[in-house]
Amino acid sequence: MSEQMNEDALVDSKKFVSRRGGFEINANPEIVPPVQRTRVRVEKSADGFAHEPLAKKYGSAEARTKIGEMVKAFIPGTTTTPLLVQKKPDGMSLVHVWFGANFPLFRHSHPKFGDCLYYVVAGEILMGNQTLRAGSTFFVPNGQPYKYTAGPAGVELLEFRAGGGVVDAPGMKLDETSFESMDRIIAGSYANDADWQVPERIGDTALRQADFDGRLSKI
């Protein structure tokens, strides 16, 4: 009975098509494993970042090397899992992002991809003088630089986009302005990497946060 109802629902959904696409399901996705440091090619890492101000300030080769060092330092503490990607104009995207304990996210922006709404699923982040815990949201207008630090249990976020970016703009723009600030990110990454434990399932960071808060025995 329920199987027939599901088939009927799928058939019926074909009548309703948005300019962004048709009915779509991505069921029970697994978290993409983090990249390990041994796989990082330091000399190539800078290719993924627009970084003209740093290159102008320090020289191209020096800037590329520093970016590579930063990427190698932080890479095992984060992972991105696509949940929905619509490639049509103004298509929506939904991405799950995890950062490990006390992960120092670098200042950056995504001018190519449009406005972005973030939802904290589990754990917490420190943004400026605010602590954003599960259920919190923040909206980043297209091209605005931002950074934050993950809390002591790490953090999981959902990243919502609905198009509207600048086609020829960089997908990832590094907005750190000095090697000193990047060195702090590098040092912070190596200082905390022993506590970077990627969750097995989306939302599992909530258990680590509850344990850290002393609430686990009450759950």
Regions found by a protein language model. Give the residues of each.
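Alpha/beta-hydrolase fold active-site loops
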Residues: 115
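Conserved short histidine dyad/triad with adjacent acidic residue
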Residues: 64-66, 72-111, 126, 131, ...
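A short, N-terminal "cap"/entry segment at the start of jelly-roll beta-barrel domains
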Residues: 2-91, 187-188, 193-219
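Glycosyltransferase-associated regions of secretory-pathway enzymes
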Residues: 2-3, 171, 178-181
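Structured binding elements
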Residues: 118
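Ligand-binding loop in jelly-roll beta-barrel domains
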Residues: 90, 131-134, 142-172
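Surface-exposed beta-loop interaction hotspot
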Residues: 175-192
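Glycine-centered positions in the ABC transporter ATPase nucleotide-binding domain
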Residues: 122-123
